[in-house]
Amino acid sequence: MTANELTTGDFTDADEPFSLFGTWLKDAEKNEVNDPNAVALATVDPDGLPNVRMVLLKGFDEHGFVFYTNFESQKGQELLSTRKAAMCFHWKSLRRQVRLRGPVEIVTAEEADEYFRSRPRGSRIGAWASKQSRPLESRFALEKAVAEFTARHAIGEIPRPEYWSGFRIRPTSIEFWHDRPFRLHDRVEFRRPVPEGGWEKVRMYP
């Protein structure tokens, strides 16, 4: 399926954003070569300077968009401080983009435990071994830490570190964009004043 074969005009008739996002994500899973769930995550530091990096979306529903990280990392510290974030998905093969922003909440311990158990064993070891976002003296130091935690957790389940969990963005704004000829793109934004409120749909100039 190519971008031209998609029923791109129909998305402007959608009444709410979550089912539309689900449809677009499924299209991306069929067309994007690598990581269709990759998303740019923007946060802000104490000086008001933005930071952005790619993360992987690990779940979404009508409550929000979920990803996981080390809370002691730069993004973890910034999210714990401001409790606000923005995301941008860009699916180049489909010529589509989705932007969203809103307040952030921590997922439940049960959600974090369930996802942590689903990760490959090596990734769970890595969560213990990596002091994310802090200076690393050498690659050998990281590999040594991996070896030490591998030995420590050689038998049985690997517990989730207390500093490792997930965040959920509860969007108050979600914008859908699709490329059109002559840069006359389609843009539709769904807005609500609070995460629990109803959606207002606004068509935007490109």
Curated annotation (Swiss-Prot):
Catalysis: reaction(s): pyridoxamine 5'-phosphate + O2 + H2O = pyridoxal 5'-phosphate + H2O2 + NH4(+); pyridoxine 5'-phosphate + O2 = pyridoxal 5'-phosphate + H2O2
Family annotation (Pfam families): PNP_phzG_C (PF10590), PNPOx_N (PF01243)
One of the GO BP terms on file: pyridoxine biosynthetic process
Residues noted as binding substrate in the record, renumbered to the chain: 58, 115, 119, 123, 183-185
Source superkingdom: Bacteria
Enzyme class name: oxidoreductase
Cofactors: FMN
EC number(s) on file: 1.4.3.5
Cofactor binding note: Binds 1 FMN per subunit.
Annotated binding of FMN, by residue: 53-58, 68-69, 75, 97, 132-133, 177, 187
GO MF annotation, one: FMN binding
Pathway membership: Cofactor metabolism; pyridoxal 5'-phosphate salvage; pyridoxal 5'-phosphate from pyridoxamine 5'-phosphate: step 1/1; Cofactor metabolism; pyridoxal 5'-phosphate salvage; pyridoxal 5'-phosphate from pyridoxine 5'-phosphate: step 1/1
Signal sequence residues: none
Keywords from the UniProt entry: Flavoprotein, FMN, Oxidoreductase, Pyridoxine biosynthesis
Function (record text): Catalyzes the oxidation of either pyridoxine 5'-phosphate (PNP) or pyridoxamine 5'-phosphate (PMP) into pyridoxal 5'-phosphate (PLP).
Membership in a protein family: Belongs to the pyridoxamine 5'-phosphate oxidase family.
HAMAP family for this protein: PdxH
Subunit structure: Homodimer.
Official protein name in the record: Pyridoxine/pyridoxamine 5'-phosphate oxidase
Source species of the chain: Sinorhizobium fredii (strain NBRC 101917 / NGR234)
